[in-house]
Regions:
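Hydrophobic/aromatic beta-strand patches that form the interior of the parallel beta-sheet core
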Residues: 15, 33, 58, 77, ...
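Active-site glycine-centered loops adjacent to acidic/histidine catalytic or metal-binding residues
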Residues: 18, 61, 102
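Active-site donor-binding loop signature of nucleotide-sugar glycosyltransferases
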Residues: 37, 48, 81, 91, ...
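A glycine-centered loop/beta-turn motif at secondary-structure junctions
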Residues: 88-124, 128-131
Length: 134
């Protein structure tokens, strides 16, 4: 449930993929909307905002996170080139990142591997203790 996930995000790092991306946005006050045409297949170009690099991504979803009234605690990290929808986000103060595509599908040999590397670096920054009940 959303409350349980919200509680987890208060004390644990998280990497949201696809629906997880949308859920993280909702937890922090973001909104989603139904796409006119869903993103399907392994050829969706996504731009990493910081580097300007464009990656081919594998996607399969019919909703997207809205950039309107975007949560103040989150930064947009990736945008879909085809329709300028939010394809990645990062929490400003917590080790929480998410992407709207399937980096584990890797259309190329190492195209999106850096997402996992970035998350590993985030969680290595401190020692994490899982509270009883999670």
């Amino acid at each position: 449930n959303i409350k349980g996930l919200r509680d987890c995000l208060e004390s644990l790092p998280a990497l949201g993929i696809c629906l997880g991306h949308q859920i993280i946005a909702h937890i922090y006050g973001g909104e989603t909307f139904k796409l006119l045409f869903g993103h399907r297949g392994g050829n969706q170009p996504v731009k990493e905002i910081e580097s300007g690099r464009v990656y081919p991504t594998s996607q399969n979803h019919g909703y997207a996170v809205s950039d309107k009234n975007f949560p103040k605690d989150l930064n947009i990290t990736h945008m879909n080139i085809n329709d300028n929808t939010v394809s990645g986000l990062k929490h400003k103060n917590k080790p929480i990142i998410s992407i709207q595509y399937h980096s584990e599908a890797c259309p190329g040999p190492v195209d999106s591997e850096y997402i996992f590397d970035n998350f590993i670096e985030l969680i290595k920054e401190k020692e994490w203790i899982v509270k009883e009940g999670f």
